[in-house]
């Protein structure tokens, strides 16, 4: 059995990323921009077959890298993305911390 190749690309509207494996859509993450310095990750979904292949984590990484490049902080409304932001310190630099 050949190794499957998963690729990640940004949606044409720039508001999310999708994952493809051999031409098949296997996952996506969506977000909205808030002002000039924040973005909200609102949804991450991965087909069941690919949930253990780190597709969701890699989609979160794609969004975080975009946030870094655009000098934005990320608010995680999606439970999966929030869990990844809590679990992996690599996201600390783009995590939005609300202060009063």
Language-model segments: what does each one mean?
Residues 10-17, 92:
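A short helix-loop-beta-strand connector motif used in the catalytic cores of GNAT acetyltransferases and
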Residues 24-32, 40:
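Conserved beta-strand in the GNAT
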Residues 44-51:
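A short, internal acetyl-CoA/4′-phosphopantetheine-binding micro-motif in the GNAT/acyltransferase core
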Residues 15-26:
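Conserved beta-hairpin
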Residues 64-79:
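Conserved GNAT acetyl-CoA-binding A-motif
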